[in-house]
Amino acid sequence: MWNGKKKAVTFSIDDGVVQDRRAVALLNKYGLKGTFNLNSNYLGQGGLTTWLKKVVSHSKVEASEVKDLYKGHEVAVHTLTHPHLEEIEDEAEIVRQVEEDRKKLSELCGYEVVGMAYPYGTYNDKVVKCILEKTGVKYSRTVKSTYDFTPQKEDLLRFHPTVYYVEKCLEEVVDKFLATETDEPQLLYIWGHTYELDAELITWEAFERVCQKLANRDDIFYGTNKEVLL
């Protein structure tokens, strides 16, 4: 349990794009917490991306704002440059991508970064072994939705989230979580990218509606990924 509470909610948001500013404001408004997974080599860079034929900003937040922007939340590793780690043959390069990102982000934030999300959600046994043996990362998130609320207590370098927030079943999953009554611990872990909200894969209004539903519940612990997993 979490501080005596049987339920916990956490968010995980990738890439460190400027739309995170709006998402952080919403999470703060409703007393929710999240973990933001950043590529330190890309901080401050501009860019665009296309989703559902809609061009949206993929510009990254500035390094100078990371500490204050994500205050009260958690910053975590997303590697230096967002490669497919499982395609890298050189183990030293896998370690460099992860550990140098972790160290740079730790310096920016003023605390030791210990979490991670895999770029593209992809990995293999070699990647996991490198991270386990040669980095300071304690957990790493995949992109495989479980739609289940049973907390994963083992193999945290292959941690699977509950639901991706662009999935049509998001609100159904949230409602099911809220309605579940059990003596067993229950974790709702929601992940995504905030530029997807601009692309309206899920609207900002729908995202806020989910935040409203989850907020101000006496039986729920609101924490970062680190706080609910470690």
Where do the PLM segments sit?
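Boundary/entry segment of secreted carbohydrate-active catalytic domains
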Residues: 1-19
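C-terminal domain-boundary segment and adjacent tail
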Residues: 1-2, 29-31, 40, 106-107, ...
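Hydrophobic "anchor" residues on beta-strands that sit immediately upstream
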Residues: 10-11, 74, 220
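Glycan-processing catalytic domains of CAZymes
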Residues: 12, 77, 145, 151-182, ...
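Active-site metal-binding loops of divalent metal-dependent hydrolases
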Residues: 13-16, 79, 194, 225
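A short acidic, amphipathic alpha-helical/loop segment
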Residues: 22-26, 126-131, 210
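Short amphipathic alpha-helices and their capping/turn segments at secondary-structure boundaries
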Residues: 24-29, 58-70, 175-181, 211
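Metal-dependent polysaccharide deacetylase catalytic core of the NodB/CE4 family, i.e.
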Residues: 30-126, 146-147, 152-158, 186-197
